[in-house]
Regions:
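Single, function-defining residue in the core of a domain
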Residues: 1-62, 66, 79, 90-93, ...
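Extended, structured, electrostatic nucleic-acid-contact surfaces
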Residues: 67-76
């Protein structure tokens, strides 16, 4: 990693990336976050919670006990801390502080990757979706969903680039409100941005407003939608596109005042998909590709739930839960920075696993192992062309070139 002190331990380097001392001190000073805190300052809290998420700790006592590890204690300059102190601190840090830190870190990732140069033909894609996380209603009364069930919704916008995705914005709500209630908070209004979301955000009045304000979107239409076809556009019969048309949606008072573009295609299993958009400068095939990228936000939710432990929370208040979610996004951005700055081309999961295995070693050793090329290369399992082998053997026999039959080293697979 260029410009980094590789003599430090991987643990030290990770904590420094997480806390970004200059930026964090500036924000803490502006918001007065650490003003009366003596022991567990924000940079240490960030490091502890991030480590707990990466290592899949189950509770506050396990976080507190990890300081018995001399390497962790030394890296944090913290001998011990009580579990209740971690709980109070996590619940008291202003969420605005962590949100601001996340947004600045996200912008740094975007600058490092150079998204404007990697977005390619389809343009600047922003994927929008939500994921519900179940909670125990007796412990999280503020997140009551049903009488016997609690939960929250994590509404998220992520930005697509060639190598993957970067989280862009998050809104946390109780699980009850519909997805479309958070559309205005997540939709990007810049003219070069395309917002991609699923059928849960279908709202004709909202779509008319987006058309008025030249906000671009691509979504999926529900099966029971009322459609009035105005113009049928030409479709390449050799493509996967079945229909491309200009339509009006709804009827009577619910009829949209702006026409939209309707594209019909199929998924990999042959099921019909109807895509709705106000984008006019991309082909139907390109717009189908745009909507296929929406799956990446599902994979992102799965990744952070499995590998950053956002299904289990260390605090019970809404502020503690939201703070932990922001720390998970901050941790993800730090992993993206490590991947980009090190030049590693493998998956983020492989990088994370090696990072955890090398925490107590030097950062230079971690980089060496991360970028090490395999000593042996395998051709894998080969699919044999039995017809070709038979034809070749038959030809040799017919021309009486049969000496090979007495050769114990002969291999008919090597032609």
């Amino acid at each position: 990693m260029q410009g980094k002190d590789t003599t430090k331990s991987t643990l030290n380097q990770l904590f420094e990336e997480l806390s970004d001392q200059k930026l964090l001190k500036q924000l803490c000073k502006e918001l007065g976050v650490d003003k009366y805190v003596k022991k567990l300052k924000l940079d240490k809290l960030l490091a502890l919670i991030a480590l707990a998420q990466l290592r899949q700790y189950k509770g506050l006592r396990e976080i507190s006990s990890c300081l018995n590890d001399e390497e962790i204690s030394k890296a944090l300059n913290l001998d011990s801390i009580h579990a209740s102190t971690i709980s109070r601190r996590l619940a008291s840090v202003p969420t605005k502080m962590l949100e601001t830190f996340f947004l600045r870190l996200k912008n740094e990732c975007i600058a490092n990757i150079g998204l404007n140069a990697t977005e390619g033909l389809l343009g600047r894609l922003h994927l929008i979706d939500s994921s519900t996380i179940s909670l125990c209603v007796t412990k999280y009364r503020w997140a009551e969903f049903r009488r016997t069930k609690g939960g929250i919704k994590v509404h998220l916008r992520i930005r697509v680039h060639d190598g993957g995705v970067i989280p862009d914005k998050m809104v946390m709500t109780p699980a009850k409100p519909a997805d479309r209630t958070q559309m205005d908070a997540l939709v990007v209004e810049e003219p070069d941005a395309i917002n991609v979301f699923d059928r849960g955000y279908l709202d004709y009045k909202q779509f008319d407003q987006y058309c008025d304000n030249q906000i671009l979107f691509v979504t999926r239409l529900k099966e029971n939608a009322i459609i009035e076809v105005m113009t049928e556009l030409n479709v390449n019969p050799e493509s996967a596109i079945k229909k491309d048309a200009i339509v009006f949606l709804g009827k009577n008072n619910q009829r949209m005042k702006h026409p939209l573009r309707l594209i019909e295609t199929e998924d990999t299993e042959g099921n019909p998909i109807r895509i709705l958009t106000n984008v006019t400068d991309l082909t139907a095939v390109e717009l189908a590709d745009v909507y296929r990228h929406r799956w990446k936000i599902e994979l992102f939710f799965k990744w952070i739930k499995q590998h950053l432990k956002v299904k289990h929370f260390f605090g019970h208040s809404d502020q503690a839960v939201e703070n932990q979610l922001y720390i998970a996004l901050i941790t993800f951005c730090v992993l993206i920075k490590l991947q980009k700055n090190s030049g590693y081309t493998g998956t983020l999961l492989e990088l994370t696993r090696l990072l955890l295995a090398c925490l107590h070693g030097s950062f230079s050793d971690f980089l060496a192992k991360l970028l090490r090329k395999p000593l042996k290369s395998s051709r894998g399992r080969r699919i044999l062309n039995h017809d070709l082998i038979f034809e070749h053997t038959y030809e040799q026999v017919m021309t009486e070139n049969i000496d090979f039959l007495y050769d114990s080293t002969y291999d008919p697979i090597i032609l």
